[in-house]
Amino acid sequence: MHKQADTLVHVSAAARKTLLLDVYKRRRIEACGVLIGTIDEMGNWRVEAVHPLRNPFDSPVYFEFDPEDLLRVDLLYPERVIGAYHSHPTGFAKASGTDRKNMQRINVEQRIPWVWLIIRGPFDRDPSLLQEEQASQSILPVPSFIAYHHYADKGLQQIGLRFDEE
């Protein structure tokens, strides 16, 4: 797998905070949700907000979205769901085989141009401390983020990430 050089995922400061709070609150399972934003004419994703979704499996190694929850969010943000995220609380540092199959199915077979963020654990901080640290402007512990997109012609590619400052 190669890193796609020309495209980026831009993540707003507010979206990043929501991602971090979600993965730390649900640190024992694969936290998951969708990314809200836009895709520009060059194929760059701009994540402006995050909408956490329930993982009905409550599993540290597997996630799925409840289809009704996903439909509700899609209706709430028409044409603005641009991707999905989930955590790997066990620290697995790349897309799993299941992740890869789902990325190919969504991006290539269904032709949905989502970007995929994986946030790697472990997430061993108390979420209430994270909120206090945010309020005091302290530095949050930053887990590693990986972004992917599965292109029809290039296969699975890692996408560069850029996080906006506050």
Residue positions per predicted region:
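Conserved beta-strand-loop surface patch within small alpha/beta domains used
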Residues: 1-81, 90-166
